[in-house]
Amino acid sequence: MDTETGLYYYGARYMNPVTSLWYGVDPEIEKVPGCSHFAYTFSNPITLIDPNGQSAKVTVNAHSKTIVVSATLVFYGECASAAIATQTAADIQNGWNEAHGTVKLGNTTYNVIFKIKGEYRDVSGWLGLKRAELKLEMAKNTDPEINYIEVVKYATKGSIPGISNFDIGGNRGEFQYNNIQGSGTTTEAHEFGHGLGLKHPDRDLRKKGQPGIMAPRNTLVDPKYQYNPKAKPDSRNGGTLNPAKRKVTQEDIDNLKINKLHFKDGKAYLGHAT
């Protein structure tokens, strides 16, 4: 409870415990347009829980001047494996840490460190019982640090078939195996950025230098970042972004708006549990 106002604080908004009314709209209401702006868990608190209206955990350490963004990625599906879980988590962690990002809170500059853990869940077996068990776990999950990613031969859940996808600001994704095959690929870090709430930037980044990690395929970029540096800037002859040449930049870190989060006991959250 907030001692000054007498209201309950839930990280994203306040609730009056006397009237049971929320003060302020749900910050993720744009993702659920059919729900009241002031509702809690779709007005269904029996089966749903929303601990803070927001998903990776962000922890501030004032002593070491670091901000740690942590998440656990649970991989399952026809192409998932323990090796994929380990490799993909490492690619995401390394990709985001490559920026050596910083955030300023007040008058203090903090180094941003990403700590990503990968877990594999085998959902094969008789009668699909393991898959059903995982689906139940996903439905009941309220921990915004835990993300569930299905690894498939061909992705179908996104806006474009055949492309890996992740809920914007959410904690569920679908990775197409050939998009993430091999170490050092950038699709994983790109999709994780969506999970943190980031969207695609302008599709024309010519004369803007290094493309950030959120630049999508078919983006127009400076020649050295194209599939074919000698091609004209179009999608016919390799004249668009080679995804292998995008990377996390300080601008991507800035776009997370960590400095705008409301920290309680040194912790806050990016995104939300879906």
Could you describe each region identified by the protein language model?
Residues 2-7, 11-57:
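Short turn/helix-capping motifs enriched in Asx and small/polar residues
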Residues 62-85:
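Fold-level signature of zinc-dependent metallopeptidase catalytic domains
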Residues 72-76, 152-154, 198, 216-219:
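Active-site-proximal beta-strand/loop segments in catalytic clefts of secreted hydrolases
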Residues 168-183, 202-274:
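Metalloprotease/metallohydrolase-associated module, dominated by Zn2+-dependent proteases
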